[in-house]
Design a protein with these regions (language model features):
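Short His-centered aromatic/hydrophobic patch
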Residues: 86-92, 114
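Conserved donor-binding/catalytic core segment of Leloir-type glycosyltransferases
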Residues: 4, 175-199, 205-216
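A conserved, positively charged/aromatic
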Residues: 104-138, 150-151
Length: 220
């Protein structure tokens, strides 16, 4: 069996990690795993597992991305995957528009995964257009059935996100020396944020500024 997964890029994030884990599992089970994306730093890790990456600019949130529909349909005709799995909205639209014009007798089966609570509009609705729709939790299933009532409930399956035991061992405890360094770095950062505040502002304002600074720190 050949399975093609489609997502914007392979840099970091839960969707990306899940894509790699599915591809790795498929290869270990003797199947062929393909991933279509704009690329990224996780491509090498994907290919190490034996999966194949196909670079295509399916990541841009613009109308220009519609020019990728024909090339993507050509790719489907060449690769002939058994399953086409869409994981994000922009590549989802590209893949869906390419797929729906293909011969129903020979085109791949379409699967989509709804990973979160997307904004409710026609743009997000593509994630419910799979012949089978995967919801990552019961809350997501409820979101789909409530916000997109036209979705046939029988085609929705709840498949919870798994955890790789080797990467998250149950009894793991970090070394005390590492914890001491980590805590010191965290408090040093928070102290630097608080010390920059105007002494006349309220505690609530300080907290808000700290939260904003934390967001900026995470972004960098």
């Amino acid at each position: 069996m050949k399975v093609m997964q489609v997502l914007p890029e392979l840099n970091s994030g839960g969707v990306e990690r899940g894509t790699l884990e599915v591809a790795d599992f498929l290869v270990k089970q003797g199947h062929e795993a393909l991933v279509v994306s704009n690329g990224g730093r996780l491509v090498a890790k994907l290919e190490e597992s034996g999966a194949r990456h196909i670079a295509m600019p399916v990541h841009r949130k613009s109308l220009g991305s519609l020019f990728q529909v024909r090339p993507f349909r050509k790719l489907l005709e060449q690769e002939k995957p058994d399953i086409l799995h869409i994981r994000s909205r922009v590549p989802g639209w590209i893949a869906y528009l390419a797929w729906r014009k293909m011969d129903k007798a020979t085109r791949p089966r379409l699967v989509s995964t709804v990973h979160g609570f997307y904004s409710v509009n026609r743009y997000s609705a593509v994630m419910t257009k799979g012949e089978r729709v995967i919801a990552v939790s019961e809350s997501i299933r409820e979101y789909i059935t409530t916000k997109y009532p036209a979705t046939v409930q029988e085609k929705i399956s709840v498949i919870h996100r798994g955890v790789e035991p080797s990467q998250f061992p149950r009894d793991f405890q970090p070394e005390p020396s590492w914890l001491e360094i980590w805590r010191g770095e965290q408090w040093e950062w928070w102290d630097s944020v608080i010390m920059r505040q105007d002494p006349c502002i309220t505690t609530g304002q300080i907290l808000l500024n700290c939260l904003c600074a934390a967001v900026e720190n995470e972004a960098t």
